[in-house]
Amino acid sequence: MANPAPNLECRMYESRYPDVDMAVMIQVKTIADMGAYVSLLEYNNIEGMILFSELSRRRIRSISSLIKVGRTEPVMVLRVDRERGYIDLSKRRVSDEDKEACEERYNKSKLVHSIMRHVAETVGVDLEELYVNIGWPLYKKHGHAFEAFKIVVTDPDSVFDALTREVKETGPDGVEVTKVVPAVSEELKDAFLKDIRRRMTPQPMKIRADIELKCFQFDGVLHIKEAMKKAEAVGTDDCPVKIKLVAPPLYVLTTHTHYKEKGIVTLNKAIEACITAIEEHKGKLVVKEGARAVSERDDKLLAEHMAKLRMDNEEMSGDEGSEDEEEDTGMGEVDIDGGSGIIE
């Protein structure tokens, strides 16, 4: 007979109900005559109610403008009747600070819950059992299980090996005894580790600065090449610096790092090193856009810009005569790894 499927329904926190004056995340389910019925997302979707009088501090002109079915948002807990399971909530009493803190907590809890649920399903254990033995103890010890999971990424044993649970066994003499055993088996540890590292390993961000670099002196291109090398030499193992030509005289400096502030500081130092080197040969560096974190969209726009500039340069080169081609402006394309420093 096949094993029954594990129960994957469970609240996120040990307490079955939220505390009064606590901000919680809800989703609106239905709108009735007196108020809106909602699900408390962090408490296994138990039902709560927001009276229309608790929607806004101002005079209500349109209910639909204040609350809509399907909307997810933070609200404040007014009353909790644990015996009857009634929870009264307020939208008008939750402050901006409460909203921000609630959203941050909920986003962390949602990720933890997703990992817990996936592990429970993978190993075939009830989700609540996993929370009792692992999840909620981590909340108690670390303030939030999310913080514990961040440690698991690099040091899983320090988190999991400290967790224990009690089991009752009957000895040879028929007497029931309680034993303390590890809460996390090797199978569970492997499942957690795989899922946590996949979802929570921080991805390096890209930091970029845009500059103009010129040198009209004799061997100007070589001086630019040396200045670029000085800039790249500032890079470190966790903040390597690369400088790339967009189209003369435009260049971009980039680094990939887990530490945004350190990446910005490193690029600024690289720019300073480049300025010092190029000014020794009467060249000039102008910062067009300072060091900042960039997105994939920014990279796509840069690639499109580079392609357009290269195409424009090729068209201009085709229109110019051979005499113009021999002229050295000191701003030619630089191959920092090549011998001559000039891309033919």
Swiss-Prot record:
A single GO cellular-component term on record: plasma membrane
Modified residues (Phosphoserine): S56, S317, S322
A GO molecular function held by the record: translation initiation factor activity
GO biological process: regulation of translation
Domain S1 motif: start-end pairs: 21-92
Subcellular location: Cytoplasm, Cytosol
Modifications made to the protein after synthesis: Phosphorylated at Ser-56 by GCN2. Phosphorylated at Ser-317 and Ser-322 by CK2.
InterPro entries, per the entry: NA-bd_OB-fold, S1_domain, S1_IF2_alpha, TIF2_asu_C, TIF2_asu_middle_sf, TIF_2_asu
Coiled coil residues, start to end: none
Region spans: Disordered: 309-344
Phosphoprotein in keyword set: yes
Pfam families: EIF_2_alpha, S1
UniProt biased composition (Acidic residues): 314-336
Main location: cytoplasm
Keywords: Cytoplasm, Initiation factor, Phosphoprotein, Protein biosynthesis, Translation regulation
Family statement: Belongs to the eIF-2-alpha family.
Self-association and partners: Eukaryotic translation initiation factor 2 eIF2 is a heterotrimeric complex composed of an alpha, a beta and a gamma subunit.
Job description of the protein: Functions in the early steps of protein synthesis by forming a ternary complex with GTP and initiator tRNA. This complex binds to a 40S ribosomal subunit, followed by mRNA binding to form a 43S pre-initiation complex. Junction of the 60S ribosomal subunit to form the 80S initiation complex is preceded by hydrolysis of the GTP bound to eIF-2 and release of an eIF-2-GDP binary complex. In order for eIF-2 to recycle and catalyze another round of initiation, the GDP bound to eIF-2 must exchange with GTP by way of a reaction catalyzed by eIF2B.
Protein name: Eukaryotic translation initiation factor 2 subunit alpha
Species: Arabidopsis thaliana
